[in-house]
Amino acid sequence: MLLEAELDCHRERPGAPGASALCTFSRTPEIPMCAGCDQHILDRFILKALDRHWHSKCLKCSDCHVPLAERCFSRGESVYCKDDFFKRFGTKCAACQLGIPPTQVVRRAQDFVYHLHCFACVVCKRQLATGDEFYLMEDSRLVCKADYETAKQREAEATAKRPRTTITAKQLETLKSAYNTSPKPARHVREQLSSETGLDMRVVQVWFQNRRAKEKRLKKDAGRQRWGQYFRNMKRSRGSSKSDKDSIQEGQDSDAEVSFTDEPSMADMGPANGLYSSLGEPAPALGRPVGGLGSFTLDHGGLTGPEQYRELRPGSPYGIPPSPAAPQSLPGPQPLLSSLVYPDTNLSLVPSGPPGGPPPMRVLAGNGPSSDLSTESSSGYPDFPASPASWLDEVDHAQF
């Protein structure tokens, strides 16, 4: 609290008795006591501050002891001059922790106030001017930008160059043998290893952690290499299978091509212009598109007209009933093979005919005479054996 002292001057009244000069108050019967020296005030002038009386020489600043004549400031029972009061109880500098007089120019950084000479970098001691970049630390210290970046760089380098622990060959052998026994040893085992090797307990623990991480990483890399080799082999095998399909020649046997060369020729069993003679003629090979599962060769000729069916024996497996409609009423020539179906089974070709025409025929292909080619797509059709010899014996050759 600031209190301005009131200075009361009491002059002697002329013509008064001499005893009255001892009293500064006309109506006060007693002599006042000085608050500074605890003596009676017999001076001509009396000072009054804090509701107490003072000698003019006793009212002084508590810090600088300068006599106070016009104005003073007090805090508690002490009296101060203006400068000392603001130094002690006013705003303090964040750097030197001293009070700042209200008449002095200051600098501010956020909520902190500094003297002009205290507003400087703590590293290079350079006083910061208006416009300079600086960093305000947590303890209200100031660091210029150049020194701050340099300190950060040194700290990063010191962190990167942490001290390394050197393990001798004997210590490494002991740790390896313990790892082979148990990759994750208990605490008492680590303590025993620490005493045997002379290494710190923390060093032993970190060594086991790094060892387990290394083993896990090696296993993961090995698995990745195995899968990579597997996929490379698969890609290589696919490429070689495509080249093998392109290099297959017409006379070569495969899983999809079966040649019945050992069976008797059907041309020897029928007339020259019959169906069996036309089956022995060469025909263009029908194959699957490029990129399919395999190529299929048909060693049978096309059927040119319905006259050939009349020469077949009634009861023959190839017998087809005559068409009820006249040839003139039939639509235009229809393709005998309207669609090609390539199932994943051993069937190479499944043609289908138009309604009212000849029943669809099935070309069989297999791995040998004993193969069974009955599939779901052949439901409704009689399943013939793979070899024609097994059912040709039932045909009466005398009628041909």
From Swiss-Prot:
GO terms for biological process: apoptotic process; dorsal/ventral pattern formation; inner ear development; lung development; medial motor column neuron differentiation; motor neuron axon guidance; negative regulation of apoptotic process; pituitary gland development. Residues 368-380 have a biased composition (Polar residues). Mostly expressed in the pituitary anterior and intermediate lobes. It is also expressed in the pineal gland and transiently in the primordia of motor neurons including the spinal cord, pons and medulla oblongata. Residues 160-219 bind DNA. It is found in: Nucleus. InterPro entries: HD, Homeobox_CS, Homeodomain-like_sf, Lhx3/4-like_LIM2, Lhx3_LIM1, LIM_Homeobox_TF, Znf_LIM. Residues 319-334, 352-361 have a biased composition (Pro residues). Keywords: Activator, DNA-binding, Homeobox, LIM domain, Metal-binding, Nucleus, Phosphoprotein, Repeat, Transcription, Transcription regulation, Zinc. The modification Phosphoserine is found at S74, S237, S241. Interacts with POU1F1. At neuronal promoters, interacts with LDB1, in motor neurons LDB1 is displaced by ISL1 and a ternary complex is formed in which ISL1 contacts both LHX3 and LDB1; allosteric structural changes in the DNA binding domain of LHX3, induced by the ISL1-LHX3 interaction, may explain differences in sequence specificity of the different complexes. Interacts with LDB2. May interact with CITED2/MRG1. Transcription factor. Recognizes and binds to the consensus sequence motif 5'-AATTAATTA-3' in the regulatory elements of target genes, such as glycoprotein hormones alpha chain CGA and visual system homeobox CHX10, positively modulating transcription; transcription can be co-activated by LDB2. Synergistically enhances transcription from the prolactin promoter in cooperation with POU1F1/Pit-1. Required for the establishment of the specialized cells of the pituitary gland and the nervous system. Involved in the development of interneurons and motor neurons in cooperation with LDB1 and ISL1. The LIM domain specifically interacts with the POU1F1/Pit-1 POU domain and is required for synergistic interactions with POU1F1, but not for basal transcriptional activation events. This is LIM/homeobox protein Lhx3. It comes from Mus musculus (Mouse). The gene is Lhx3.
